[in-house]
Amino acid sequence: TVLARPSKANKKKLAPYANQIRVVWGDLTKYEDVLEGVRGADYVLHVGGMVSPAADYFPNKTRYVNVKAAENVAKAVLAQPNADDIKVCYIGSVAQTSDRNEPIHWGRTGDPICISVYDHYAISKTLAEKAIVESGIKQWVCLRQSGILYPAILKNYDPIMFHVPLRGVLEWATVEDSGRLLANLCEENVAPDFWNRFYNIGSGPEYRLSNYEFECKLLKTISCPAPEKIFNPEWFVLRNFHGQWYADSQVLEDYLHFRA
């Protein structure tokens, strides 16, 4: 079962799978829609919500949508007759641990939650994570997603690119790895001690880059020189963003074996 908004884009994307899955056309902020989506589920993967850069333009809407959605998911799961048997996965964000420029650029899930100034998206993800963890759901897991690498990333021309400090770092996750880990999470052979814990999602050592290195690689794909050759370095912020290299991303890989 997939819960999706009845937009033209979603209907086009899901049309090829119409005979293979059950689609609930609805809204995560409407409890009855979420309840219908959860009905009969053994696993609930709460992946949807508002993300940047849209989240930066609509901060109040972002907080409402992301928090309300998590509350509805928790309420719907607990309303099921087999609630204690349902396994729930919530997708958090690297943004929850804020600015991590060197020398504090290595991080773990146990690090303090620390949100960048004006980052309403990170606030919403933290409150939503709390709503799931403290709801009373018996079997939950929180996976904090990093930046996702996907082919259309080159089409995202937005001022947010200057909100990223060049000396910052990030351990990226590919879209393929991200999808595979959700599929593997639903397998019956997942160890019992996997649940009721927090994990960081990352595609591993080869995907640990400084933001400057990433900008260079990105620009090279469109035959452009290094950032300092075409941008004024002063256009980029120096801090108050997020991103880190994970000291513990291998833990999730050891459980779910999702990396290519």
Q: What is each of the regions a protein language model found here?
A:
Residues T1-A9:
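Conserved glycine-rich Rossmann-like NAD(P)H-binding loop of the short-chain dehydrogenase/reductase
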Residues A9, T29, K61-N72, I115, ...:
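Glycine-rich NAD(P)-binding loop of the Rossmann-fold in SDR/ketoreductase-type enzymes
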Residues A18-K68:
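NAD(P)H-binding glycine-rich loop region in Rossmannoid oxidoreductase-like domains
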Residues G48, C89-S93, R144-S146, G202:
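Active-site beta-alpha turn of Rossmann-fold NAD(P)-dependent dehydrogenases/reductases
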Residues M50, E71-Y118:
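Conserved Rossmann-fold NAD(P)-dependent oxidoreductase catalytic core, especially the SDR/UDP-sugar
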Residues Y64, Q96-V141, P165:
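Catalytic helix-loop patch of NAD(P)-dependent Rossmann-fold dehydrogenases
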Residues I123, V164-N189:
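Substrate-positioning beta->alpha
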Residues L181, L185-Y255:
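Mid/C-terminal beta-alpha module of Rossmann-like enzyme folds, strongest
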